[in-house]
Every structure is written in C-alpha cells, then in structure tokens.
Regions:
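Short, basic, alpha-helical segments at the C-terminal edge of helix-turn-helix-like DNA-binding modules
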Residues: 42-49
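Helical hydrophobic small-molecule/effector-binding pocket
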Residues: 62-88, 150-154, 172
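Short, hydrophobic secondary-structure boundary micro-motifs
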Residues: 11, 49, 81-86, 125-129
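Short helix-capping/turn signature of helix-turn-helix
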Residues: 30, 86-94, 147
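Helix-turn-helix
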Residues: 1-35, 39
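Hydrophobic alpha-helical connector segments
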Residues: 39, 53-78, 134-138, 160
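Short alpha-helical scaffolding segments that buttress acidic/His motifs in well-ordered protein cores
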Residues: 85-86, 141-145, 163
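Amphipathic alpha-helical packing segments from all-alpha helical-bundle domains
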Residues: 77-81, 85, 94-123, 132-135, ...
C-alpha cells in the first residue's frame, strides 16, 4: 500500500479495506492511527534491514557497513520519503508508541553493530580502549548512518575510510 499509494494512504479505513476486514477488526489491534503507523514504521525498518541468510557480512565491520548503506538505498527506493517522514513524525511526543518502536529498532541496529565490531578479527588489538569502546564507535557509525539517511547519501566511502584508519591501520 505504501509503495503504491504513499504514506498518506495509510489509515485505519484503508488498511481495513486492503485486508478485506471491518474497521472494527483493525481497531482490535490498533487503538489509533498513530499506533497503526508505529507498527507500520517498525515493520518497514525490519523489512529494510532484514538479516540475510548469508551471515558473512556480519563478520567484518567494513562489509557490514557497506551492506547497511546498500539497504538504506534500497529502503529509499522502495519507500520514498520513509526515512525523513518517519523521523519527523515519530519524534513528536504524542506519538510515544511510534517513538518507542523506532528506538527499539534503532537499538537493535546498534547492538548488531557492536556485535560485528567485537567479532571482527581484522581490528587491531589496541583499537579500542576504556574511553573509546566498541559501543562508542558503534554509536559514531550509527550517527553517520542517520546523517546519511537524512541527506539521502548512500555512498559509504568516507565511513569505510574512517573505519579503515581507526580500526585496521596502525597509527604512526
């Protein structure tokens, strides 16, 4: 529905019609349009970043980041306006369920980035310290990812170079 008619087409009545059920049936699951939209946003995030069967891209930080940026570009093409519209709409306080769902999805992405950083055998032994942890670097990578989403810039080149210089190369 979103891909064909856009975000504005999503409401309780249109979802009920598309599913061939009564409006009341939809209200059994969602109390409001905001709650419905929160579930839709969460579903789209999961579809965009669904973990592939080939796990090899999660063994290496650079390969993982390249995959994430490819998926961001895919998401932008499949769901035009998703990244900007949902970010603006769900940061409003009255949409706390949508905000909670978005934060849960973002936390999942952050956790996966941390796992990849901890598994990556190519990372120098001294790359992380007590002050500069894998979690800290995952936060930086995630911030760069969000910035790229808002700018619709899906070229990971600069981020991959930052990773290479920060984690893999020995400083002189």
């Amino acid at each position: 529905m979103i891909q064909q008619q856009g975000w504005s087409a999503v409401n309780i009545r249109s979802v009920a019609a598309a599913c061939g059920v009564s409006v009341g049936s939809i209200y059994n699951y969602f109390d409001s349009k905001a709650e419905l939209m929160g579930a839709v946003v969460e579903s789209v995030w999961h579809e965009i970043f669904h973990r592939p069967e080939d796990e090899s891209m999660f063994q290496d930080t650079q390969t993982c980041i390249a995959w994430i940026y490819e998926r961001m570009e895919y998401g932008c093409k499949q769901y035009p306006g998703f990244f900007t519209l949902h970010s603006l709409g769900f940061m409003q306080e009255e949409k706390s369920d949508g905000k909670r769902r978005m934060q849960r999805t973002w936390q999942h992405i952050l956790d996966e980035l941390c796992s990849v950083l901890k598994r990556d055998t190519k990372i120098r032994a001294d790359a992380f310290t007590e002050q500069f942890t894998a979690e800290t670097f995952a936060d930086v990578l995630f911030s760069l990812m969000l910035s790229a989403l808002l700018r619709q810039d899906y070229n990971p080149g600069a981020v991959l170079e930052i990773i290479r210089r920060t984690l893999y190369e020995k400083a002189d």
